[in-house]
A protein has these predicted regions:
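Positively charged, low-complexity intrinsically disordered leader regions
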Residues: 1-52, 56
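Phosphate/diphosphate ligand-binding glycine-rich loop within oxidoreductases
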Residues: 32-41, 47-159, 278
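Phosphate-coordination loops involved in phosphoryl transfer and adenosine-cofactor binding
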Residues: 33-39, 166-168, 268
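Glycine-rich phosphate/diphosphate-binding loop of Rossmann-like nucleotide-binding domains
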Residues: 44-67, 159-236
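Hydrophobic/aromatic ligand-binding patch that stacks against planar heteroaromatic rings
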Residues: 57, 99, 130, 191, ...
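Rossmann-like adenosine-cofactor binding region
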Residues: 212-287, 292-293
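C-terminal helix-to-coil terminal segments
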Residues: 289-320
Length: 320
């Protein structure tokens, strides 16, 4: 595997899951694979789980790691071509990216949607430039449209906790005071569509996602109806995708908060969220603190998903 930006890059998903479970049994069995290899992790946006889990995964494989926060201590980067650079951005991404590639073997990039230009966001303007100009394997640590490391961890978690071969998985929109990207819900829907699970997406009207990610999922505007018989509830806020409201908060309807009354409609479902979570906006205290909440095991699996991806990339390098 050269690059990792979506579920399709993994190839055989069942095989990738098996690799993940083997790694989870012994995280250090491939500790020589990354010897004398350096991972550069580039953050345009804040991170807790992604930063820690990916760095730990690289260390498990014997890699050296360098972490660069673009907005703290590095030069501000210009991303547009044709711009007269007489402002506060002294370096262009087109020089910075190949320079970064000189100092590492693998690059991880975290760059959220900016909500300034929908086309730029959905063409992955930042991530794609690293793939094009770095001459290194590149993987997404969350980009404008997808968060594949999170979705892989979500899938690992569901496989561990499911009680039936084809569980009903419901992704529900929930309120949030700020405008959030569609990357996590897009990615989660895409990965769930790659399984044979029953997948339902529920949200208020106006929060429809890009159809290419929704795929074969059933869309239900009645949240309580969607919850009926669910085995997993995956809560997440996202801003509007459809024009002319792209990137905007068009509702903060608190009736969409996941609470115990709604969870009682499910098949004793497990509650999932990628974290960080706004308590009593996204989910009530009693639900996230309940025995059915698996947000911590879900977060722990971020290390496993990252290590599986890095292992596959390193094996690709060793075959060159």
């Amino acid at each position: 595997m050269r690059h990792f930006t979506c579920v399709q890059d993994l190839g055989d998903l069942k095989q990738a899951l098996n690799e993940a479970f083997e790694i989870k049994k012994d995280r250090f069995q491939f500790s020589e694979l990354g010897k004398n290899k350096t991972l550069l992790m580039i953050f345009f946006n804040s991170s807790l789980r992604t930063r820690l889990s990916t760095q730990k995964a690289a260390m498990n494989l014997g890699m050296n790691t360098i972490v660069l926060d673009v907005n703290q201590g590095a030069w501000k980067l210009e991303t547009e071509r044709g711009v007269i650079m007489d402002g506060d951005k002294p370096e262009h991404l087109l020089e910075a990216v190949p320079v970064m590639g000189c100092y590492c073997d693998v690059i991880g990039v975290r760059s959220f949607a900016r909500f300034e230009n929908k086309e730029d966001d959905y063409n992955e303007k930042i991530l794609s430039q690293f793939i094009e100009h770095s001459d290194r394997p590149v993987f997404s640590m969350e980009a404008a449209t997808r968060h594949p490391l999170q979705s892989f961890a979500d899938l690992i978690t569901i496989e561990e906790y499911k009680k039936t071969a084809r569980p009903k998985v419901v992704m529900t929109w929930a309120p949030h005071p700020k405008s959030l990207p569609q990357a996590v819900p897009n990615s989660f829907a895409e990965w769930m569509n790659a399984t044979d699970y029953e997948i339902v997406i529920t949200h208020p009207e106006g929060y429809e996602l890009d159809p290419r990610f929704v795929g074969n999922a059933k869309v239900e505007y009645d949240q309580k109806k969607a919850f009926e018989g669910a085995d997993f509830i995956y809560a997440k806020n996202w801003s509007a995708y459809k024009d002319p409201n792209y990137g905007q908060v068009i509702s903060t309807d608190r009736s969409w908060t996941v609470d115990a009354e709604k969870m009682a409609l499910t098949n004793n479902a497990y509650f999932m969220h990628c974290l960080p979570v706004r308590r009593n906006m996204i989910v009530s205290d009693d639900v996230i603190e309940s025995p059915q909440s698996i947000v911590i095991p879900e977060a722990a699996n971020r290390e496993i998903s990252a290590q599986t991806v890095l292992k596959k990339i390193l094996m690709g390098l060793s075959n060159l």
